[in-house]
Amino acid sequence: MISISFNGIDPLFMYTQLLKETFLEINDDDTKSIKEFVDYCRLQGDITENHIDKIEKDYRLHTPIWWYTGPYFIYSMVNRGLRLMDVDIILKMGFFIRHLHQHIENLHREQQSTDTTSGTPFQVFRGQSLSIENFEKMKQTKGGLMSFNNFLSTSRDRNFSLEIFARPAALIDSSSVGILFVMVIDPMLCETSSTPFADVQQESFFEDQEQEILFSTHTIFRIDQIEHIHDDHTNRLWQVDLTLT
């Protein structure tokens, strides 16, 4: 589950924004940082040694997006650290968080300059579960701002996001609801946004799998509309319309 904070309600909102600015500005020695990271991973006891060895030997042979989307522990560890605000993990993975952010930023710049339709607004989708507590916070913040405190994977395919993620999330846990986020992205307005996004289909470990658009960490959206989705299987399915700020 992606961590979310709400402006005006959640003190975590401003704290996470300041944290993002801080760790993106730090410049570490990459060689030293990678060594410290793999040493840290070996102490955890629940990470496959072969995966650690591969990162140690081959990290520079692949892009950060390739590592992030691959069948390794990078994805789960970095998002667990950001979700739980685990300072240990964030510090050990600071080099990777910066590399991934910079890779998304560079792709965003390239795609905006070469895509002839880049000025046209478009929609992306994300299905996930949300605790009832956070859903109530979201309803209180309608018209305000919310932040996704992790790197954010979205899809251009609405049905994929609804059928594979949002509906199952509504059915699995009675203490949560299933959410289909519908995000409107206006590239012209996004020039002032501090959070880049990019189409990563060609960069992903699994190419062309789900028409994925990846946003950097701590992306801020405005909550425009919250409405119930009529569904034959559950009454705990909601659509939330967002606009990237």
Language model feature labels by segment:
Residues 1-245:
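Mono-ADP-ribosyltransferase
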